[in-house]
């Protein structure tokens, strides 16, 4: 889990657009965040396996 202070800091609007960065909406992780879902890869995988993200299926070929 991310520090509460960093999560609160991220919710404030950035002074400049280049300072803005993505964080996971669920756990606050700053790295490996999918913009479309606003989730990190770890949370995305957990929710996808549970079937809580509509339209997402595990690839098999």
From Swiss-Prot:
GO terms for MF: rRNA binding; structural constituent of ribosome; zinc ion binding
Q: How is the cofactor bound?
A: Binds 1 zinc ion per subunit.
State the Gene Ontology BP annotations. Answer: translation
- Could you tell me which InterPro entries the record lists for this protein? Ribosomal_uS14, Ribosomal_uS14_bact, Ribosomal_uS14_CS, Ribosomal_uS14_sf
Q: How does it assemble?
A: Part of the 30S ribosomal subunit. Contacts proteins S3 and S10.
The record describes the protein's role as: Binds 16S rRNA, required for the assembly of 30S particles and may also be responsible for determining the conformation of the 16S rRNA at the A site.
Q: What is this protein called?
A: Small ribosomal subunit protein uS14
From what organism does this protein derive? Streptococcus thermophilus (strain ATCC BAA-250 / LMG 18311)
Report the gene name.
rpsZ
């Amino acid at each position: 889990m991310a520090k509460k202070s960093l999560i609160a800091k991220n919710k404030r609007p950035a002074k400049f657009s280049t300072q803005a960065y993505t964080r996971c909406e669920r756990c606050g992780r700053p790295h490996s965040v999918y913009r479309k879902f606003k989730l990190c890869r770890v949370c995305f995988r957990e929710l996808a396996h549970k079937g809580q993200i509509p339209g997402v299926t595990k690839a098999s070929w």
